[in-house]
Regions:
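Short beta-strand segments
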Residues: 1-2, 29-32, 128-131
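Active-site nucleophile and cofactor-binding loops and adjacent substrate-binding regions
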Residues: 1-3, 81, 98-104
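Short glycine/serine/threonine-rich phosphate/pyrophosphate-binding segments
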Residues: 2-11, 36-39, 104-111
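Gly/Ser/Thr-rich beta-alpha loop segments that engage phosphate groups in nucleotides
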Residues: 4-7, 32, 60, 134-136
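Short, glycine/acidic-enriched capping/hinge loops at junctions between secondary-structure elements
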Residues: 9, 40-41, 138-141
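Active-site/ligand-binding loops adjacent to catalytic centers
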Residues: 14-99, 143-167
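Catalytic phosphate/nucleotide-handling subdomain of diverse soluble enzymes
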Residues: 108-167
């Protein structure tokens, strides 16, 4: 969660649908980067710091609405470290083929953290929403490569040799 607009809008949509169709409401979980977690810490962060640049927000615009959504849904908000975010980032890219920016992976990191601590509800469907494509933050992807990007001569042999070196 950065400015908390998404979780607020999602909750509003769920409530409106529930009121029209009498559906069950979900329990909402929100995760902020540890270095930019004003809602978790209940204080404005003057100089937020995190690798997850899209959620590097020290004073969210929808702060109170997000707290209301979490309270009304009996949900929770927690923080995740940059290391947990990067672990989730690599897991999603490597195992699932999902290339999303680090900020989006805060939700995955949070679910992993809840699962490891035994706090994830058992027998429930869990949905994590990843809104940001990995191309929004290519520097993180490049920094994690084992085989660094380099200019190649424009010939088939060089390209094949480079690809074989990456596999």
């Amino acid at each position: 969660m950065g400015n908390a607009g998404n979780i607020t809008a999602y909750w509003q949509g769920f409530v409106e649908y529930h009121n029209k169709k009498n559906t069950q409401l979900p329990q909402m979980f929100g995760f902020q980067a540890e270095g930019a977690s004003p809602i978790v810490q209940n204080k404005i962060i003057k100089n937020p710091e995190t690798i997850a640049t899209a959620i590097r927000i020290g004073n969210p615009a929808s702060w109170q609405k997000a707290v209301n959504a979490l309270d009304e849904s009996n949900g929770l908000i927690d923080s995740v470290t940059d290391e947990e975010i990067l672990e989730a980032y690599q897991l999603m890219t490597t195992n699932e083929g999902v290339f999303s920016e680090p900020a989006s992976n805060a939700s995955i990191a949070g679910l992993i953290k809840l699962h490891r601590s035994g706090k994830l509800p058992k027998g429930k469907k869990v949905v994590a929403i990843l809104t940001g494509n990995g191309l929004k933050d290519p520097d993180t992807a490049i920094s994690l490569l084992d085989n660094p990007i380099q200019p190649l001569p424009n010939n088939k042999e060089s390209i094949i040799r480079y690809i074989k070196g990456a596999i």
